[in-house]
Structures are given as C-alpha cells and as structure tokens.
C-alpha cells in the first residue's frame, strides 16, 4: 500500500521540477523537510510492523514518499517520520522506505527516459551512455554504504542530525536567493 501514492506522484514529476529553479522555493521546502524530520523524535515510539500496521498507515507513509517529487523533500525521511508518528517501529519503517525508494528511483528513471525519447535522442552518444552507466554503478556502491550509515544513525540519533543539516542548507539557499 505504500507504493500506491508514489507512482501517481511521478506523473507530476515534470511539473514540480520547475520549483527547483527557485532558490526561495527550495529553501522553504528544506525548512519543511527539517521540521518533518525533527518533530517525530518528541513523540512516543511504537512497535508496529507488517502484522499490526493498517493500510491507512501504509498509505500515509506512501504519501510521504510521494512528497519526494518536491525539491528539498526527502521521501525516505518523510516516510520514516510519518511511520514513527503512526507508531511503526523506526527500523521497520526505514526498511520499507528503502524498498519504496527503489520504486521512487525507478519512476524517476522512467520519467527522465521518456523525456530523452521525446527529445529524439539528440546528443546521445556511446560515451555518454557509458558515462551514465559508470556513474550509476558508482552511485549504487555509494548508496549501499549510505544505507548502512543511515541505519546506524537512525537507530542511535533518529533524524535530528539530518534536520539540522536541512535547516542549515535552507538558510544557505535563502541567503543565496537574497544575494542573487
């Protein structure tokens, strides 16, 4: 049930990409993301898993993942935070968020691929494809290390570290918006 809201959200992917051009919009989304990540640490934790989690809670977590089409919003962080608010065990919520993250990335690849096909493959060369394949492989290896680090950080400190990072980045983006 978590994947259901994510797939339709990516039909809005092309519409929301223009928000990334506005530093003010990005800084506001980063402030919102920091709040989404920070607030759940003050709520009681639960121990729900697949046996006790309702479909509504799964849909709510999926809506958090669907919010990742907005620049500055972390889909995985939003899913885990919403799951935590609903009483889902953080570790279980993180594992599900990672699984849904694969669907999110697949939808992104499909949308970007459709954009390339609509453009008529102009400028696509073998060296460009090879570069993208190597970059994809390197990002896969980096993601594996990142997942292990993320699991350890969430288990020990929740998402408060990432919330402060988002707020600092939001202030920096807001400052750049004022200067530009």
What does each model-found stretch correspond to?
Residues 1-180:
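Multi-pass membrane proteins that catalyze or facilitate reactions on polyprenyl-/lipid-phosphate substrates
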């Amino acid at each position: 049930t978590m994947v259901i809201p994510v797939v339709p959200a990516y039909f809005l992917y092309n519409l929301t990409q223009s928000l990334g051009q506005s530093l003010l919009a990005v800084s506001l989304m980063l402030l919102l993301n920091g709040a989404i990540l920070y607030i759940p640490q003050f709520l009681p934790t639960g121990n729900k898993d697949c046996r006790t989690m309702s479909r509504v809670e799964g849909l709510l977590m999926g809506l958090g993942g669907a919010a990742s089409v907005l620049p500055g919003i972390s889909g995985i962080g939003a899913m885990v935070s919403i799951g935590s608010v609903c009483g889902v065990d953080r570790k279980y919520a993180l594992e599900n968020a990672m699984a849904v993250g694969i669907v999110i990335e697949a939808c992104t690849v499909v949308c970007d691929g459709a954009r390339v096909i609509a453009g008529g493959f102009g400028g696509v060369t073998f060296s460009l494809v090879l570069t993208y394949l190597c970059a994809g492989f390197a990002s896969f290896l980096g993601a594996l290390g990142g997942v292990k680090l993320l699991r350890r950080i969430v288990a020990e400190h929740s998402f408060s570290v990432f919330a402060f990072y988002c707020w600092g980045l939001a202030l920096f983006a807001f400052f750049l918006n004022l200067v530009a």
